[in-house]
Design a protein with these regions (language model features):
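Aromatic- and Gly/Pro-enriched helix-to-coil junctions and flexible linker segments
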Residues: 28-809
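N-terminal secretory signal peptides that target proteins for export/translocation
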Residues: 1-10
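Bacterial N-terminal signal peptides
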Residues: 13-26
Length: 809
């Protein structure tokens, strides 16, 4: 001991006084390296337990990836473009460039998985960096050289808090700056961002989950071959590929080609499901340079209607990887569907004398491009699965919908004109004459012509309005009950006849029936509106596009929304129509007032026979009666308080429903404190699968929506006093913002506490009792339950929820 003291003194400046000496000794000793400074990069204790046989990817690894990783790395907005939904996504790796960049002046090169590159080497040429070991292969190197492993280990070294909110150094905002370290950059990243391990800003993996992933990575991340079509699907694929490429035998080559092109441009993002196959077995329709019977070689174009530059074969290939809710849109193919297509497209009498070009002004305008196909056939095809096509612009590859969704209300109802109704906008002659007026900015692709575009397309819309006015100016009004015959009734059995759309800030969802209280607005959609929405925001929308492309799409969507809402207004008395229209928006529609033809259209009397002073409510009720069961069951929780609306269910379910009825009374200023979409698990006291789920949806009211660039609180001139709540007994939406968990015997107290919220402090106290924060030790257990519950509710339509928007509350 003396020797060590004297040695220390010799190395330090000697000062008088025993206390000072001790202080100096302490200071000197602190200069020694930390015992953990040079610890091993890998966890050797886990390597000692490495099994000889390969870890099963599908049986052991994939479930962990789906439940803990894909929940944030599943869509285009996955951090660092690291999509963990498939083997190809894992091998592709990460990229520092953001897909969503609303301010870029030039379009980015697309990086769509399974489309824009097919091999790992091709992705490296597109500047994607590996997250797995691609060097010397052994179990140690497989971990040392794996960014994925290093991220997992970083979380184990620096676990997050297990109570309360996350600290401010966790940035969970969508537009946060992303750091995407390569292997060479990882040590610096770990030093600067010690809490940046994975899962980021979420609870740690369990020891078992972590060990399984580490063992798999140490083994070299073995992944099985891609799934192949099942025997049941193989036969149907041959039949469908024959139909699409060869027709029925009685159709001309031109007719076959035009119909196949039309179907592809509408189904290119569908998850196809074949009759008789497993509920979770899906396929994709692609354009290939190879004929049926040969391996598919996808023709990659930026948009589905771009020139393929080579002979096209329409092929069906197995969907690979995990199914995420945000991009999961199912389209059923069956013998019955094939008969329907033959009836609408192949057996219908019409001639195709020539095929439309792939030039943008033609290809982006389906009214012109497919004029040879009868409007009735096209419209009935869209109506058969109207929800699917509406979903196209609020789901699909556009994982963030600021562009399209910032111009729609938070809750509204949608119905459609009957395809057999004798109205001008559904007639072939009228649409063919006005087709040039129905061009959209999709034809501009990525050309930046913002102001010129607005003026140009406004002029076209004016001409279209004037054409409609001229066509109906001599028509007299019809009784409101007779006017119902203009509305599509879905043949009395198709649930697509009535839809409800919910907007959740920059995402949305659509469901069958009239859901929620009577909405502020509604749409009536005709063929051209539905078709133009698809070509503007699905077929023609490019998430890699530039500022001009995104702004032009938003501006034109204003016109389409207005057209659908104005059709609804035409079913109201003219004397009330303009007043109602003005109340809907004080700002968003000011620019519409000077569109030539709108005022005249608004003043024309189309209906008569209203009996109350609230014609809008009366119209909603007329639609409910007319559509019957297709409009829904009256919505016992949100709208109908009569016992006749009460669903058949157990006493405890009815008890929960009645309690949730009171939660729908939450309205006004306090709603802004609440999450956009909150999932509620009501524990029924038995098995987990017997618990029930609710979704609490905040419906925000707006004076106007003015910009697509800034956060809502900065740019939306909100009408907070008219905010409302909708509650449904199922899981609605793809991006839950928060989870609540409550016992059935506490359900009344839950709602009482919810309704008592008046400020942020009240809400935090409510969350402390019922909420599942990002720090909760039970967070993953409940997140798993909600995904499992969704699968129970919708065995075929469900997908993995995305937790990118989960709040830190």
């Amino acid at each position: 001991m003396y020797l060590s003291v004297s040695t220390a003194i010799s190395k330090c400046t000697v000062l008088t006084g025993f206390v000072l000496l001790c202080f100096i000794l302490s200071a000197c000793s602190s200069s020694e390296k930390s015992i953990t400074a040079e610890q091993a990069t890998v966890e050797y204790d886990l390597l000692y337990t490495l099994p000889e046989e390969n870890i099963s990817f599908k049986g052991e690894v994939q479930p962990i990836l789906e439940n803990r990783c894909v929940v944030c790395h599943g869509c285009y907005d996955a951090p660092c473009q690291l999509k963990l939904t498939s083997a190809e996504g894992i091998h592709r790796g990460s990229n520092k460039e953001k897909v969503y960049d609303a301010a870029r002046l030039t379009a980015a090169k697309p990086t769509r998985l399974f489309i824009d590159a097919m091999t790992t080497e091709e992705w490296r040429q597109k500047d994607f960096k590996p997250v797995l070991n691609e060097g010397d292969v052994n179990k140690v190197r497989n971990l040392e050289n794996s960014v994925m492993y290093r991220m997992l280990r970083q979380k184990q070294l620096y676990p997050q808090a297990r109570t309360g909110m996350l600290s401010d150094d966790f940035d969970v905002t969508l537009d946060r700056a992303q750091t995407c370290p390569t292997l060479d950059e990882f040590d610096d990243y770990a030093a600067k961002h010690p809490k940046g391990g994975m899962p980021y800003a979420m609870p740690n993996l369990s020891r078992k989950e972590h060990t399984t992933l580490v063992h798999w990575l140490a083994q070299g991340a073995p992944i099985p071959d891609d799934d192949v079509p099942s025997k049941v699907a193989e036969k149907q694929i041959k039949q469908w590929e024959t139909l699409l490429n060869n027709g029925t035998g009685n159709t001309s080559d031109n007719k076959t080609s035009l119909v196949a092109r039309y179907l592809y441009e509408h189904l290119f993002q569908a998850h196809l499901h074949f009759e008789g196959t497993d509920d979770r077995e899906f396929y994709r329709l692609v354009r290939s340079s190879t004929a049926p019977g040969k391996p598919v070689e996808v023709i990659a174009t930026r948009r589905p209607y771009n020139d393929p530059a080579k002979k096209v074969y329409y092929r069906i290939t197995r969907h690979q990887g995990s199914i995420v809710a945000k991009t999961h849109m199912v389209y059923e193919l069956s013998g019955k569907r094939m008969q329907r297509f033959e009836e609408l497209f192949y057996d219908a009498e019409y001639e195709v004398t020539s095929l439309p070009s792939y030039e943008p002004d033609m290809a982006s305008n389906p009214i012109k491009a497919f004029a040879a196909i009868p409007v009735s056939s096209r419209y009935k095809f869209l109506l058969d699965e109207a929800r699917f096509f509406i979903e196209g612009f609020i789901k699909g590859p556009v994982c963030r919908g600021q562009t399209a969704l910032s111009v729609i209300e938070d809750q509204f109802w949608v119905v459609f004109f009957d395809p057999d109704a004798d109205i001008m906008p559904l007639k072939d002659d009228f649409l063919n004459k006005t087709a040039n007026y129905l061009a959209s900015p999709a034809e501009l692709e990525d050309n930046f012509k913002l102001l010129a575009s607005k003026t140009h397309y406004k002029t076209l819309i004016e001409k279209y309005f004037q054409s409609k006015v001229a066509a109906v100016k001599n028509n007299g009004p019809v009784d409101i009950r007779d006017a119902m015959n203009y509305i599509w009734k879905g043949g009395g059995k198709n649930p697509n006849a009535a839809l409800t759309i919910f907007r959740h800030l920059d995402s949305a969802s659509v469901n069958f029936g009239f859901i929620g209280d009577y909405p502020e607005t509604a749409w009536v959609i005709d063929y051209s509106v539905l078709e133009r929405i698809h070509y503007l925001l699905v077929a023609g929308y490019d998430v890699y596009g530039n500022l001009g492309h995104q702004l032009n799409a938003r501006l034109y969507m204003d016109f389409l929304r207005t057209e659908g809402e104005d059709y609804f207004l035409t079913l109201l008395p003219a004397e009330k129509r303009q007043l109602i229209r003005d109340e809907w928006y004080q700002g968003i529609r000011k620019s519409d007032r000077n569109i030539a033809g709108v005022d005249l259209w608004m003043n024309m009397e189309f209906v008569s026979g209203y009996k109350t002073g609230n014609p809008q409510r009366e119209l909603y009720q007329q639609l409910e009666r007319y559509l019957g069961p297709l409009a829904g069951d009256g919505d016992y929780i949100n709208r109908c308080r009569d016992e006749g609306c009460q669903p058949k269910a157990s006493k405890n379910v009815i008890r929960a429903d009645k309690a949730m009825q009171r939660a729908t009374k939450m309205e006004g200023l306090v709603v802004k404190i609440l999450p956009d979409v909150a999932f509620v698990r009501v524990k029924m006291g038995g098995k987990p699968e017997n618990d029930i789920a609710y979704t609490m949806i905040s419906n925000k009211a707006y004076h106007s929506v003015t910009s697509m660039f800034q956060h809502e609180s900065l740019h939306d001139r909100r009408d907070y006093r008219n905010d409302t709540q909708t509650v449904v007994r199922w899981l609605e939406g793809s991006y839950p913002d928060f989870f609540y968990v409550v016992e059935i015997d506490d359900i009344e107290n839950f709602v009482d506490g919810y309704n008592a919220i008046e400020n942020r402090k009240d809400y935090e106290q409510f969350v402390a009792r019922y909420g599942q924060r990002r720090t909760s030790e039970d967070f993953w257990k409940h997140a798993d339950w909600f995904n499992q519950q969704y699968a129970r509710e919708q065995p075929r339509l469900s997908g993995i929820f995305d937790l990118n928007r989960y709040q830190n509350r």
